[in-house]
């Protein structure tokens, strides 16, 4: 549920949406099957339709860009399990398995659409290495029943925010919000805003005892 929320919300057009999914090889088959099952049940349609759960992208141009990015990912070794079709500004919810860690989408190519690229790993250190091999670093998330391991990974991610066992775009107004590397300069949030808008001045009084 959290994976779909983090990827499909607003048709995947969110800056801090979950865009790459790193799954341990021992869980990849089960994870992929569950995601495909959930995604296949999503009703696509217009926002005015109360039963619709997934709308179109912001424009047909944006959908065409997603189409090209998916095609590139397949060319680089990924395999479409479900979806992969465009209809005007609509793009079907898509799952791409077997994505190699050398693929563009595993590094710096961000897909702003309803696409779940699945990249497998063997060890925790390998997962951290793949996650950090990007010039971007806004948000990330970690799913694990091992809290010690989860906090270790969260602290190791080169990003401005990390959510444990939840979608990556969790945000509360009092939290500092910002990224590392190419993902912005500075942070937003109540205290961050106060600090940003506060001008400090030092006044020194000398020779007071003369």
Question: What are these language model-derived features?
Answer:
Residues 1-101, 164, 210:
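ALDH superfamily catalytic-core signature
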Residues 43, 76, 92-210:
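Conserved C-terminal structural/oligomerization subdomain of aldehyde/semialdehyde dehydrogenase
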């Amino acid at each position: 549920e959290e994976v779909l929320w983090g990827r499909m919300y607003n048709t995947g057009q969110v800056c801090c949406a979950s865009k790459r999914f790193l799954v341990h090889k021992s869980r990849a088959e089960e994870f992929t099957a569950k995601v495909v099952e959930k995604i296949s049940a999503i009703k696509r349609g217009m926002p005015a339709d109360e039963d619709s759960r997934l709308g179109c992208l912001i424009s047909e141009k944006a959908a065409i860009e997603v189409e090209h990015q998916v095609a590139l990912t397949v060319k680089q070794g990924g395999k479409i399990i479900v979806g992969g079709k465009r209809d005007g500004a609509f793009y079907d919810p898509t799952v791409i398995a077997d994505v190699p860690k050398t693929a563009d989408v595993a590094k710096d190519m961000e897909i702003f659409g309803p696409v779940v690229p699945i990249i497998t790993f063997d060890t925790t250190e390998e997962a951290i290495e793949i996650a950090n091999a990007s010039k971007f670093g806004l948000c990330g998330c970690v799913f694990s029943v091992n809290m010690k391991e989860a906090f270790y990974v969260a602290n190791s991610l080169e990003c401005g925010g990390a959510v444990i066992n939840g979608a990556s775009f969790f945000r509360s107004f009092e939290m500092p919000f910002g990224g590392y590397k190419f993902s912005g300069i500075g942070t937003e949030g109540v205290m961050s805003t106060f600090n940003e808008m506060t001008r400090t001045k030092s006044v020194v009084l000398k020779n007071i005892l003369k």
